[in-house]
A protein has these predicted regions:
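Bacterial N-terminal signal peptides that target proteins for export
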Residues: 1-9
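Short, low-hydrophobicity acidic/polar segments
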Residues: 80, 86-149
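Beta-strand-rich domain onsets/edges
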Residues: 25-47, 127-156, 165
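Structural motif
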Residues: 42-66, 160-169
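C-terminal motif of bacterial Sec signal peptides marking the signal peptidase cleavage site
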Residues: 16-19
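Short, acidic Ser/Thr/Gly-rich low-complexity loop/linker segments typical of extracellular
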Residues: 71-94, 178-204
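Hydrophobic beta-strand segments
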Residues: 64-72, 172-176
């Protein structure tokens, strides 16, 4: 439910950000929207569609996964669908005329870890939201690669830092409140030594206390727009951070 098409977030994406010039007094390229007001109105119905895949090294469709849309703070789902054989889903969400602050909940009868996908900003237009799920075995391998020992009952948040155009941002640092163990990718895999995002913009916040978590990022000297997600115990929460 983000403003741009993307795959969230443990997908191994390598994107090189294009360099462009700007006036020395103007905003840093890619951060022109920093601080701009968010939309306050939305069409009566917005559609969220995409593909659910699994297997980090070779993503493949996940059929028969349950995808439900919720408004934050409300346990009644707004819309739902089941992925088809190619892993596609589509949910139409009634907005009431205002952007929807909510999330997607994705599950597939225990074959993969339950996953929750949050937008960087409230949903005010149709979007494509592709979600990559991981199995418990894959999660353990990824955690080991990052030098993390998962704590039972802890939350895990995967983040992609993007600029105003939706391109992943390299060199960003991510923090949260409450704090967790932060890691980044290097060479397309979680690293125990990387200190900022690679070209894929990916960061991980592990062993964070379950409940509401504020996620933040700094990139190119800019503090990006922070927002709150709910990190469920022993589940995966996915989100993006944008200016």
């Amino acid at each position: 439910m983000h403003r741009a098409t993307r795959t969230l977030p443990i997908a191994l994406v390598a994107t090189v950000l294009a360099a462009c010039g700007s006036d020395s007094n103007g905003p840093t390229p890619g951060f022109e929207c920093l601080g701009q007001a968010l939309p306050t109105i939305a069409p009566p119905l917005v559609n969220v569609s995409g593909m659910v895949t699994a297997n980090v090294l070779s993503p493949a469709p996940v059929p028969h996964a349950f995808v439900y849309a919720f408004r934050t703070g409300d346990t009644t789902h707004l819309a739902g669908d089941t992925t088809d054989t190619p892993g596609q889903y589509s949910v139409g969400i009634a907005t009431g005329g205002t952007p929807v602050n909510g999330y997607l909940a994705i599950s597939d009868s225990g074959h993969h870890i339950d996953t929750y996908a949050y937008p960087a900003v409230p949903l005010a237009a149709n979007v494509t939201d592709n979600v990559l799920m991981v199995s418990s075995n894959e999660f353990s391998l990824l955690a080991a690669s990052a030098g993390i020992t998962p704590v039972a009952g802890g939350g895990f948040i995967g983040v992609v830092v993007r600029n105003c155009q939706g391109a992943p941002v390299a060199g960003a640092t991510v923090t949260s409140s409450p704090a967790g163990t932060v890691r980044y990718n290097a060479g397309g895999l979680p690293s125990s030594t990387a200190t900022s995002t690679a070209a894929d913009g990916v960061a991980y916040i592990a062993n964070v206390a379950p409940g509401n978590v504020t996620v933040r990022a700094t990139a190119s000297g800019h503090a990006l727009r922070e927002h709150v997600v709910n990190a469920r115990a022993d589940a995966i929460t996915l989100t993006e951070i944008q200016p």
